[in-house]
Amino acid sequence: MATSAISTVLGKTSVKNSPSDFSTTCRELNETFASGRTKSIQWRKWQLKQQWWMIDENENEILAALTSDLGRHEMECRSPDILGLKTDILEHIEKIEEWAVTKPIHDAGLLFGRLGKARLLMEPLGVVLIIGVWNFPFLLTIQPSTIRVVTGGPQETSKLLENKFNHIFFTGSAKIARFITAAAAKHLTPTTLELGGQCPAIVTKSANIELAAKRIAAVKFLNAGQICLAVNHVFVDPRVHDEFLSKLEHYMRQSADTGHMCRIINRRNYGRLQDMVNKSEGKVIHCGLGPKGKNSMGPIIVANVSLIDSVMSDELFGPICPVLKDAVSEAITAINSLPRPLALYIFSSDNAETERIQSGTISGGVTLNDVTMHAGVPNAPFGGVGDSGMGYYHGKYGFLGFTHQRTVVEPPTWLDYVMGFRYPPYDMGNLSKLAVPNRLGFRKGETMEDQILGSSRSR
């Protein structure tokens, strides 16, 4: 949910902040959807273009609100919330006809495909509840859709969830997601969850240490590490540990010296982070000062920590970077002992090493020798797995997440001439028509070694 200045800008869309208005709002939106006027491609394109101009004409106010509430530098404000949102809008305007067109089912066979004209209708689900979060409030809430905005916190969210929606999209923590999904279950409402988690980085003995330190320091600096995709902690091979630690400290200090770091969002989260550092048994290395003002925290490295250290007890969501001295085998074991993360970052120049880590772990996505980049791949799904989320979005995959793919088929009326056997009384003489021959020709008694890859047949 949004903070004060951001709430004011978001409220320019169509804001409903009183819980007493929520039922009315949901009813009005459902009535609008039921009228059918929001379903046409023309209407959706028009709405997308209105969103573009809303962002474009209010750009200075958006930037000012993000700076006021989050203390972010203009470059950090523009990159995700302005650039990211405008890019999404353009992609949807350009692609929505292609995504929404009725699609013939080409592999449906003679009966259903050619004769029955089997096809998929791409129909919008209906009224969707999007529960965004404060770290990227515009990018994560004003995604292409028809909007009524509610700003607030847990109380407003709880009241909203008493209403029935056709889909719920939530960005936030796994703890709150459990509450969201429990409320959604009462109405059998499907959900998409983007949750984050403790995203690890692995720096192997073959890594470019300079590059790894520079890029990990940068993502811990961005939005003061308050990003679901930020590196939470780093596993470093003992043979390059000291070199990496030295370079990481260098780049963190360099970033802090710019004065461009934003602050921690509120006093509660600031206190949570300070408490984790104070209780740590690792070596705490302060790498410079944070911004002036309240809730200010500079970059911090915590070295020589274990998995049971206080700074490893939860997703950090701050400018703190625990460093664990572990070789690849130990790092894989440690990663698999924790909830599945939204992202995994592997720094290595050894392809076999990289493949070993990828195949030995599970995560929402993977970026090699960089950070967060997999989330920006065009035409690719983005989402978590396990405790880091469920479902996908971005581009076509977000469109499909809010779409019901409705199968339609038109069997010809003369079909009874060839399928009359389906009606009672049943004639056992037609039993052969229900037999399924082994058209692939595989044999009983085959072993795993007999299986041929790259072919639909097993010989």
Residue spans for each PLM region:
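ALDH superfamily catalytic-core signature
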Residues: 13, 175-307, 368
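Residue-level signal for inorganic ion chemistry
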Residues: 44, 89, 147, 168, ...
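Conserved residues at the C-terminal ends of beta-strands
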Residues: 131, 153, 171, 219, ...
